[in-house]
């Protein structure tokens, strides 16, 4: 019963069509992000997500942002996962297991509840957050709740420290990402809205780039859920290192359907909220700048800028 209730809330808070008020929402024109505030007032508050992450030079260095400790993510036999198409995204729920996130300057110990994706109709868009004005083809959100609140539903309604979401950008690569293969093989079973199945033998750790490059390089700000009801209870972390994905693998996401019919024609694409005003909030970085990192960031920005015009 607890698992059913958890799935029900996850669907409500992170991607169903119907909210508690019965109001519908989507990413379309009639009930898309520009209309969310009328049914979900929180969506019009001043600490909303996503945002445009400024250049690292314009961020504030925070020495308290130490490396993360992710526990329980490595061995698939230690947890039970279910993969779901909720009509807005593909989502993987943690049904059983003790997956936790702490460190990284987080205000406590957080329990992992689910992860999901946002992607575009092409490689020029898709991520919810922007990096100095540039978009990525996809973004992964790993959703965790503060254990002191006891449950995801209780934590999501709290102020500022209820949830911790880890965000990762994706970049297109010539090589297939083997860490995604097991999950992508299940897409045929969750092609339509409402479809759900078990996801076995999938190592969450293998999907994440935390063991590659600089896992202690990340950005931090205070924000909200990026879907209704838009609670401003999220400690956001966006990692500098991106996850690679091949063109063929990316195409599999774009074949998932909003419809609950196998012959449906409405594919899930452009399921991202536009960036929201940063306002008086600060974006912090976990690392000090040096000439090498400045060159890296400048080169990345130039590459993304040039790609837009090829």
Regions found by a protein language model. Give the residues of each.
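Alpha-carbonic anhydrase
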Residues: 1-310
């Amino acid at each position: 019963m607890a698992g059913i209730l958890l799935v029900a809330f996850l669907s409500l808070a992170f991607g169903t069509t119907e909210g508690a008020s019965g109001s519908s929402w989507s990413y379309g024109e009639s009930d898309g992000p520009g209309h969310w505030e009328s049914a979900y007032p929180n969506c019009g508050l001043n600490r909303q997500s996503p945002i445009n992450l400024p250049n690292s030079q314009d961020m504030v260095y925070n020495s308290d942002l130490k490396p993360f400790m992710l526990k329980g993510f490595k061995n698939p036999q230690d947890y039970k996962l279910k993969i779901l198409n909720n009509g807005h995204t593909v989502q993987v729920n943690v049904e059983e297991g003790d997956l936790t996130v702490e460190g990284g300057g987080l205000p406590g110990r957080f329990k992992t509840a689910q992860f999901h994706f946002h992607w575009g109709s092409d490689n020029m868009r898709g991520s919810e957050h922007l990096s100095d004005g540039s978009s990525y083809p996809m973004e992964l959100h790993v959703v965790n709740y503060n254990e002191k609140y006891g449950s995801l539903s209780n934590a999501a309604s709290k102020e500022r420290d209820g949830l911790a979401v880890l965000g990762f950008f994706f970049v297109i690569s010539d090589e297939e990402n083997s860490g995604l293969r097991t999950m992508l093989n299940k897409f045929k079973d969750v092609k339509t809205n409402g479809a759900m199945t078990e996801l076995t033998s999938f190592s969450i750790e293998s999907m994440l780039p935390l063991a590659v490059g600089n896992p202690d390089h990340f950005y931090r700000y205070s924000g909200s859920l990026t879907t209704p009801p838009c609670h401003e209870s999220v400690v956001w972390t966006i990692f500098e290192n991106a996850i690679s994905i091949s063109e063929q693998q990316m195409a599999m996401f774009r074949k998932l359907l909003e419809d609950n019919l196998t012959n449906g024609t409405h594919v899930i694409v452009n399921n991202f909220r536009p960036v929201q005003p940063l306002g008086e909030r600060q974006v912090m970085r976990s690392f000090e700048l040096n000439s090498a990192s400045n060159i890296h960031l400048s080169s990345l920005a130039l590459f993304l800028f040039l790609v837009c015009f090829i």
